[in-house]
């Protein structure tokens, strides 16, 4: 009975599971029936989320064109704390580069990694003193067309970035890529096509659950094998229109929409 369910398209309450025929087994899967809207950005902040990150305790939310500002969501109480430290804002803007707008963030021990929305720089901030310690500058493609870093994850050894290139005459397999980065050199040591989504939409989400990468684009959630870049499974979350951030806290995926909404998807 289970195999029959996995080999068919399951659609319940506006949610769909799209199985990959190459998949042999699934390790642990989200409980898609329990997807829940849990928070909205505070009204005093621009309602445009660019990325999410989990710091080991709470969920961090960065703002698109927010000049380094961010907010922290308490997972237990769902209360917000809005950043008011200019040193933090300055460091984020410095690493994000063009237009001072982060497109992806993730925590790696005592480092906060930031990728610019316009793909011109990425690097990390030492969270002990909030200095922009390392910045890797330069676009991934030497091309005048717009590019963007739109989601970051740390797997314990490497940084992963969801990258978008606004060359719409090319197939998405060339313009939407998952980049594997050596954190010491900033060099790309692996490249895989991202699951397809809206060609001209740079909003993404990317995170690591200890075994797999998770990627969100539009309404489509994908789990990805980091060794091969193969999509293991996909879930269509109809309630989410324009995902812009993804974070894993050990129990659930937190999903941001560009319009300021925060969703929680338990496993």
Description of each model-found segment:
Residues 69-74, 120-124, 176-179, 220-222, ...:
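A short loop-to-beta-strand structural motif that recurs across blades of beta-propeller domains
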Residues 26-46:
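A short helix->beta-strand "capping" segment at the edge of beta-propeller domains
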Residues 2-28:
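Bacterial Sec-dependent signal peptides at the C-terminal "C-region" and cleavage site
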Residues 36-43, 80-96, 131-143, 187-197, ...:
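A short beta-strand motif characteristic of beta-propeller blades
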Residues 242-267:
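Blade-level signature of beta-propeller repeat domains, shared across WD40, Kelch, NHL, RCC1
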Residues 44-55, 96-108, 140-156, 162-165, ...:
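Beta-rich, blade/repeat-based domains predominating
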Residues 74-78, 126-130, 182-186, 225-229, ...:
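Short loop/turn segments that connect beta-strands within beta-propeller blades
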Residues 61-67, 114-119, 161-173, 213-219, ...:
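Conserved beta-strand positions in repeat-built beta-propeller and related beta-rich domains
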């Amino acid at each position: 009975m289970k195999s029959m369910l996995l080999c068919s398209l399951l659609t319940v309450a506006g949610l769909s599971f799209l199985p990959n025929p190459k998949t042999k087994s699934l390790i642990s899967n989200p409980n898609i029936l329990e997807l829940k809207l849990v928070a909205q950005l505070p009204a005093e902040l621009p309602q445009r989320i660019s990325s999410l990150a989990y710091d080991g305790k709470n969920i961090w939310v960065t703002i698109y064109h927010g000049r380094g500002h961010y907010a922290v969501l308490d997972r237990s109480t769902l209360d917000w704390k809005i950043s008011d430290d200019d040193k933090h804002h300055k460091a984020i803007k410095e690493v994000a580069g063009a237009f001072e707008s982060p497109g992806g963030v993730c925590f790696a021990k005592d480092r906060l990694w930031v990728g610019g929305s316009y793909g011109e720089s990425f690097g990390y901030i030492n969270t002990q003193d909030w200095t922009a310690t390392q910045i890797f500058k330069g676009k991934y493609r030497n091309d005048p067309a717009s590019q963007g870093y739109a989601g970051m994850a740390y797997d314990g050894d490497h940084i992963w970035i969801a990258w978008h290139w606004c060359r719409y005459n090319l197939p998405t397999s060339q313009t939407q890529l998952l980049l594997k980065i050596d954190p010491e050199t900033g060099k790309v040591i692996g490249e895989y096509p991202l699951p397809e989504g809206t060609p001209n939409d740079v909003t993404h989400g990317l995170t690591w659950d200890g075994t797999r990468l998770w990627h969100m684009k539009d309404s489509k959630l994908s789990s990805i094998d980091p060794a091969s870049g193969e999509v293991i499974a996909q879930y269509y979350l109809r309630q989410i229109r324009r995902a812009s951030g993804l974070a894993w806290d050990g129990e659930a995926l937190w999903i941001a929409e560009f319009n300021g909404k925060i969703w929680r998807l338990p496993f």
